[in-house]
From Swiss-Prot:
PANTHER family in UniProt: EF-HAND DOMAIN-CONTAINING PROTEIN, N-TERMINAL EF-HAND CALCIUM-BINDING PROTEIN 1
Transmembrane segments annotated in the record for this chain: none
Organism: Homo sapiens (Human)
Name the UniProt record assigns to this protein: N-terminal EF-hand calcium-binding protein 1
Tissue-by-tissue expression: Expressed in brain (at protein level).
A GO molecular-function descriptor: calcium ion binding
Region ranges (Disordered): 180-203
Assembly information from the UniProt record: Interacts with STX1. May interact with CPNE6.
The EF-hand domain, residue ranges: 26-61, 60-95
GO biological process assignments: blastocyst hatching; regulation of amyloid precursor protein biosynthetic process
Localization per Swiss-Prot or TrEMBL: Cytoplasm
Phosphoserine PTM positions: 4, 192, 197
Length: 351
């Protein structure tokens, strides 16, 4: 959980005043952090689009999310504030009330220890430096072990719900335009990742900065779509393709557009690298290609999957959800996702 301190003094004062006014009980400060991260246009409240972008989990349908939003919106303003979030979730915390309180204490303790380490490490003896490194490593191991347990619990509960609903819900596709660039409202992070290359370069299966063959195919698809959108298009007689009954007729092409906050570009690139490496190793992933638009921090990601079921299952994996959660912080606006089925024969011909 991120530190709730803000980079902007005015935001700092606003959060402190809000926290004081609400008299938040121990552990409830997480909802200040949730509001801050989900509030993309920095107006201090969540619209339904912002709420959906943050809370959608691939299980609840759009209608269910809409119903939940209005249940939480007790002020009937079509917006949610921290008071409403706290009021709703505090009724359902159960044992997690103690968990959130412990996380709040843990967050403060770690920040305090890190500050002490930063101040004293350089002047410490070799033995003291060794002990510090050892404690940092073991603390990280313990936290990762807890994270793994939580991720297993998440997967189990979500899979159980999907089985009860007899199949995965269709993911929400968001198309939101925000008024202007989002201001930076997060804590300055330690710059521990420093790729020196100005371009994102990953050497791995299925991922190249410039993949001429598949960029050509993608461009052909884009031109075809552009032609179909023209009103004066003259359609030629279709060329029929006979498909055998046991042949997979289509594959899923997914296009994802992401506008990255400039100051978070390096961390986004690292998260993207980990995501692509994990996704490319999946049996149902045929290929992933990436384009970065020049002179702006905008990425186009093209994913080829065997079918829509495989892609929907991929969305529920830990690595995919981790990437989605990190994008809440890294992106100026929610990503735009579009999908289309293309003939599987196109893939076979080019492989």
């Amino acid at each position: 959980m991120e530190d709730s301190q803000e980079t902007s003094p005015s935001s700092n004062n606003s959060s402190e005043e809000l926290s004081s006014a609400l008299h938040l009980s121990k552990g409830m400060s997480i909802f200040l952090d949730i509001l801050r991260r989900a509030d993309k246009n920095d107006d201090g409240k969540l619209s339904f689009e912002e709420f959906k972008a943050y809370f959608a989990d691939g299980v609840l349908s759009g209608e269910e999310l809409h119903e939940l939003f209005h249940t939480i919106d007790t002020h009937n303003t079509n917006n949610l504030d921290t008071e409403e979030l706290c009021e709703y979730f505090s009724q359902h915390l159960g044992e997690y009330e103690n968990v959130l309180a412990a996380l709040e204490d843990l967050n403060l303790s770690i920040l305090k220890a890190m500050g002490k380490t930063k101040k004293d490490y350089q002047e410490a003896s070799n033995l003291e430096q060794f002990v510090t490194r050892f404690l940092l490593k073991e603390t990280l191991n313990q936290l990762q072990s807890l994270q793994n347990s939580l991720e297993c619990a998440m997967e189990t509960t979500e899979e159980q719900t999907r089985q009860e609903r007899q199949g995965p819900a269709k993911p929400e596709v968001l198309s939101i335009q925000w008024p202007g660039k989002r201001s930076s409202r997060r804590v300055q992070r330690h710059n521990s990742f420093s790729p020196n290359s100005p371009q994102f370069n990953v050497s791995g299966p299925g991922l190249l900065e410039e993949d001429n063959q598949w960029m050509t195919q993608i461009n052909r698809l884009q031109k075809l779509i552009d032609r179909l959108e023209k009103k004066d298009l003259k359609l030629e007689p279709p060329e029929e393709e006979i498909i055998e009954g046991n042949t997979k007729s289509h594959i899923m092409l997914v296009q994802r557009q992401m506008s990255v906050i400039e100051e978070d570009l390096e961390e986004f690139q690292l998260a993207l690298k980990h995501y692509v490496e994990s996704a490319s190793s999946q049996s149902g992933c045929l290929r992933i290609s990436i384009q970065k638009l020049s002179n702006e921090s905008r990425y186009m990601i093209y994913e080829f999957w065997e079918n829509s079921s495989v892609w929907n299952s991929h969305l529920q994996t830990n690595y995919s959800k981790t990437f989605q959660r990190s994008n809440v912080d890294f992106l100026e606006t929610p990503e735009l996702t579009s999908t289309m089925l293309v003939p599987a024969s196109w893939w076979i011909l080019n492989n």
